[in-house]
Amino acid sequence: MTEKLKVPSTSRLVLEAAMQLYTTPLQQQYIEAIDFSETSGFYDELKQQYPFIADMICLRKQSIRRMLRERMPAFPGQQVIMLGAGLDPLSLYLLENYPQQISRIIEVDNGYIEEKQQLYEEIMPGNPLIRFIKCDITDTALLWSKLLENGYREEIPAIIVFEGVLHYISNDAFVQVMQLFKTPQQHHLVLLDYSLSEEEVPARFLSYHKAVKEVLENYIGRPVNVNNRADIAGLLYQLDGILDTVEPLCETEKKLTGDNHLFHAPGEGIVEMVSFRI
């Protein structure tokens, strides 16, 4: 293995929060190739302002994996398109668990995707199922051409993973990206999370919500995109999408753990999970 990869603060936060999920051999090899030694003021501040931040991220990732697992039997040979894939080793999880059900995985990101590709190549040389695209996903013309170059086919059912992305782009940009994936049969499934607007957050969690939003906005230098449930319904209406699920994090926790230790009501947890067909 080459020198370990140093990761940006946001990626470190996400990877460390979900470490308990990375238990399979390929995922463990991948995590061992990443350098987590550097301290991060951003990471520490987020944990200080919101003690449940790691739990929230872990539940979000577990929810995405659960929705993938539930979808896999629906169609043979599905495509998986990861937009804003980041450094999460979700592709390794899929290749270890569902190699016969997947025809292609395409990861798209505008940062660290080449380094990630190199790590994957060292772990599983020459794997034919996975492709990597370095691209700003909001550049829809370039994104579309790159998807076609890398084997995306509209007629093959696909799972579009849009995890941890809508917080950082506008709703208009989201709609433009999703327009690329509309199909007459509506056989693509989109999985995403979104940040809740304040009116959706119970009073006891509002201080956490405001604090996390402020830390994130100071770090990225622009507002975080927040939405209420009506906003999400409006986006789906623009896309002629068919809603599958809207899942508050309290429901996610209940499904995954059998209880509610952290989040007890809708609106707690900062984000909610959504899946829809397009």
Where would I find each of the regions flagged by the language model?
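A short SAM/SAH-binding and catalytic strip from SAM-dependent methyltransferases
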Residues: Y152, I156-D172
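A short, conserved alpha-helix within the catalytic core of class I
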Residues: L142-L143, Y168-F181
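Short amphipathic alpha-helix with an adjacent loop that forms part of the alpha/beta core around
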Residues: L142-E154
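Short, glycine-/aromatic-enriched active-site segment of Class I SAM-dependent methyltransferases
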Residues: F205-G221
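Rossmann-like AdoMet
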Residues: M1-I81, A85-I133, A141
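Short alpha-helix
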Residues: R222-V246
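Core SAM-dependent methyltransferase catalytic element
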Residues: L256-I278
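Conserved beta-strand signature within the Rossmann-like core of class I S-adenosyl-L-methionine
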Residues: Q185-E198
